[in-house]
Amino acid sequence: MLASVRVNQLQRLLLSARRLSSSPIIPPSRLLHQRLFSTSDTDASAASFSSSHPKIQTLEGKASNKSRSTSSTTSLNEDELAKFSAIADTWWHSEGPFKPLHQMNPTRLAFIRSTLCRHFSKDPSSAKPFEGLKFIDIGCGGGLLSEPLARMGATVTGVDAVDKNVKIARLHADMDPVTSTIEYLCTTAEKLADEGRKFDAVLSLEVIEHVANPAEFCKSLSALTIPNGATVLSTINRTMRAYASTIVGAEYILRWLPKGTHQWSSFVTPEEMSMILQRASVDVKEIAGFVYNPITGRWLLSDDISVNYIAYGTKRKDLGDI
């Protein structure tokens, strides 16, 4: 009965949010613009992209005039790391704080299999379509994404800045001879980029909304990607619907997540994501939304990107490494 009441509350909340928001995109504050776009350099392709997007022209006008940072600049947010360290032991509890990720994982993997098989000319019906490819999972947590990627044949490196997450991931992976081959590292994307590591595909799901500097973070992801390699990111749109469902609904009504897990001001719109990646030499090729059905408890791929969405892009081979 309690679960039914909570679902009904969430449905009413989402309906109210739809009425409140006539547009799925809500302009961010000046502070957020400075956090997202902390560099003044723009290449020709970024300028071209911006000129066709009036909203992004506004964003660029408010960007900080700081000089370009090197890849060694960290994008870590210590407060966010502390949050995830506190619940690291629950990564593989399917009914715990990470229940939404467990439920979303099959849908995320369906998008990844489809786009990356197409990108690398692989057979999506194969049991191991990613055999022979090197993938890196940035912000891997307990390994929810790294493990199925390894089972699909990829040589996987999982990276997380929280030591407890990495330990949990290693312990769980060691229970399976296939996943035990995953290389788990407690480090950052920036450090690996400085070391010159390269991968066929770089994936970072539900991470960018937790970093201190998304633009710098995406530069590091690009630096880790081989020319013409693939990049996959997922995050939460900054809309009233997203606030209603991911913060009010998931944290306060359904209590799937600890209160304070998400900050609405840190959510990233698809326009911002596209421009950030464009500046990092990654061209976004496809974006899909995730829609949750509270009756079935399942997530579906959708054209609706007003809350959760996932993006696939390619590293421009003509520009080489950044």
UniProtKB/Swiss-Prot annotation:
A GO cellular-component term linked to this record: extrinsic component of mitochondrial inner membrane
Region annotation Disordered: where it falls in the sequence: 46-75
Gene3D superfamilies cross-referenced by the UniProt entry: Vaccinia Virus protein VP39 (3.40.50.150)
The organelle targeting sequence, given as a residue range: 1-37
S-adenosyl-L-methionine among keywords: yes
Primary location recorded for the protein, binned into one broad class: mitochondrion
Residues involved in S-adenosyl-L-methionine binding: 108, 139, 160, 205
Pfam families: Methyltransf_11
Pathways per UniProt: Cofactor biosynthesis; ubiquinone biosynthesis
EC number: 2.1.1.64, 2.1.1.-, 2.1.1.114
Protein name: Ubiquinone biosynthesis O-methyltransferase, mitochondrial
Lineage: Eukaryota, Viridiplantae, Streptophyta, Embryophyta, Tracheophyta
Gene that encodes it: COQ3
